[in-house]
From Swiss-Prot:
Lineage of origin: Eukaryota, Metazoa, Chordata, Craniata, Vertebrata
Chief localisation class: mitochondrion
Membrane-spanning residues: 35-55, 76-96, 130-150
Organism: Danio rerio
UniProt keyword terms in alphabetical order: Apoptosis, Membrane, Mitochondrion, Mitochondrion inner membrane, Transmembrane, Transmembrane helix
Official protein name in the record: Mitochondrial fission process protein 1
Cited function: Involved in the mitochondrial division probably by regulating membrane fission. Loss-of-function leads to apoptosis.
Family classification: Belongs to the MTFP1 family.
InterPro entries for the chain: Mitochondrial_18_kDa_protein
Length: 165
């Protein structure tokens, strides 16, 4: 989430370049606290992240519609923008990091229960702290990996469609 060196050529994307981006990580916080809170709280954190993903997709669709104007193919342009954003956000903000934090916490709790004699509450809080501390380290690698995945798969379909127009 560092501001890019070339801030003059690209407008700020509120969903990716500001504090709003952290709403996409709400489910990771929920996963980190899974051992300490009711499962409903974890699911609620996924609701926050999903709302964030949906808002970004709608925003990108509106911007694509405005940029396209009244030229033919507007619906396709908007659809591509919405699908690309939704898939990217669903992977980079919800699915991959949620799974990653869930597994880090599960492995941490398992290892702590096997290697320490700490009381259960201490193990749970330690697991939560490990999960939360992992979040800053996984964000950039996951974002870049999802970009690479989409660039080598789904986005190739979009660019082929643009060449045909």
């Amino acid at each position: 989430m560092e501001p890019s060196a070339d801030t003059h050529s690209k407008p700020v994307d509120i969903y990716r370049d500001t504090w709003v981006r952290f709403l996409g990580y709400a489910n990771e916080v929920g996963e980190a606290f899974r051992a300490l809170v009711p499962v409903g709280a974890v699911w609620a954190s996924y609701g926050v992240a999903t709302t964030y993903v949906t808002a970004d997709a709608i925003d990108k669709g509106r911007k694509a519609a405005a940029a396209h104007g009244e030229r033919p193919g507007k619906a396709v342009c908007v659809c591509v923008a919405v699908v690309d954003t939704f898939v990217w956000q669903a992977l980079a903000s919800v699915a991959v990091p949620g799974f990653t934090i869930n597994r880090v916490c599960a492995a941490s709790h398992f290892l702590l229960s096997r290697t320490t004699r700490w009381p259960l509450p201490v193990r749970k809080w330690t697991t939560t702290a490990i999960g939360l501390s992992t979040i800053p380290f996984i964000i950039t690698p996951i974002d870049r990996s999802v970009d690479l995945l989409l660039d080598s798969s789904l986005r190739k379909l979009y660019s082929e469609g643009e060449k045909e127009d």
